[in-house]
Amino acid sequence: MAKIKIGINGFGRIGRLVARVALQSDDVELVAVNDPFITTDYMTYMFKYDTVHGQWKHHEVKVKDSKTLLFGEKEVTVFGCRNPEEIPWGETGAEFVVESTGVFTDKDKAAAHLKGGAKKVVISAPSKDAPMFVVGVNEKEYKPDIDIVSNASCTTNCLAPLAKVINDRFGIVEGLMTTVHAITATQKTVDGPSSKDWRGGRAASFNIIPSSTGAAKAVGKVLPALNGKLTGMAFRVPTVDVSVVDLTVRLEKPASYDQIKAAIKEESEGKLKGILGYVEEDLVSTDFQGDNRSSIFDAKAGIALNDNFVKLVSWYDNEWGYSSRVVDLIRHMYNTQ
């Protein structure tokens, strides 16, 4: 069986984890990485040792030369181009490019990869104009003529499957979401300048920081039935990985909390198996580290005020779960061609 050949632009948190997911997949082959800011020996070090996800234990990673990494026997070509138009993806056979720099998130900028020979681009961030797909929710709307897509955000990937189940079964009149979100790379280690978001410039390890998120509104893009019905905000908290969504909704059809739990459990074992999880144990955030599902509903943590108004809680490994979906979306696009 032919493998799906992928390239990664930007070897940061998501880029490296997408590489880990790809290298553990039988049907996906990582053929190239582009990052103008990291040398091959430093790439090897950053890939091998990860504070959150631990040391890479699968096969040896070493530098063959300044343009090639070896993952076991597998050669991966390394480029160092600042301009995405100049990356020769075609030379390596990379059909799908994961755009994970966080810089080229709109359609025009991401399209630069096509000039170098890539066939499709998956942006690992929300995009203002590229179509957004959340696996398990709306990926079936992808058509083979779409060349540039967004995998939305980690929070949208957690929220959308849960919101879909609730809306399909009971109907959502309106809702508010809060994500209690782990630290990410854009935050500061100590107080520093952040002109657009003053609170975001405060020390990440010492503060609970209220922040904005477009995740709830983005659900309206992947689930048009919920457009204008959800909004939300974030609290950035001093943990390094794993976040949790609190979705509070008013229901159209009255339902007891037990009925809601049963519906979510059923979907988690059916159509959304592997995407939506369901737990009844007394778990905490670190218990979900390395969980590759998008959203794990915590049956014990939620609470209903009455049969029309309910708070639902769902966990997600905002790094590993999201990176797993990037690769799943590529698989879906490949199989749809």
UniProtKB/Swiss-Prot annotation:
GO cellular component terms, A-Z: cytosol
Active site, renumbered? C154
Record EC number: 1.2.1.12
Please state what the protein is called. Glyceraldehyde-3-phosphate dehydrogenase 2, cytosolic
Binding of NAD(+) occurs at R13, I14, D35, R82, N318
Tell me which domain of life the UniProt entry assigns to the organism this sequence originates from.
Answer: Eukaryota
Q: Name one GO molecular function term.
A: NADP binding
What does the further note read? Plants contain two types of GAPDH: cytosolic forms which participate in glycolysis and chloroplast forms which participate in photosynthesis. All the forms are encoded by distinct genes.
PTM note says: S-nitrosylated upon accumulation of NO in plants.
User: What are the subcellular locations of this protein?
Assistant: Cytoplasm
Q: Where does D-glyceraldehyde 3-phosphate bind?
A: S153, C154, T155, T184, T213, G214, R236
Q: What class of enzyme is it?
A: oxidoreductase
Report the function annotation for this chain. Key enzyme in glycolysis that catalyzes the first step of the pathway by converting D-glyceraldehyde 3-phosphate (G3P) into 3-phospho-D-glyceroyl phosphate. Essential for the maintenance of cellular ATP levels and carbohydrate metabolism.
Q: What is catalyzed by this enzyme?
A: D-glyceraldehyde 3-phosphate + phosphate + NAD(+) = (2R)-3-phospho-glyceroyl phosphate + NADH + H(+)
Please state the pathway this protein functions in, per its UniProt record. Answer: Carbohydrate degradation; glycolysis; pyruvate from D-glyceraldehyde 3-phosphate: step 1/5
This chain is encoded by the gene named GAPC2
BP-aspect Gene Ontology terms: glucose metabolic process; glycolytic process
Q: Site annotated as Activates thiol group during catalysis: where?
A: H181
User: Pfam families in the record, alphabetically?
Assistant: Gp_dh_C, Gp_dh_N
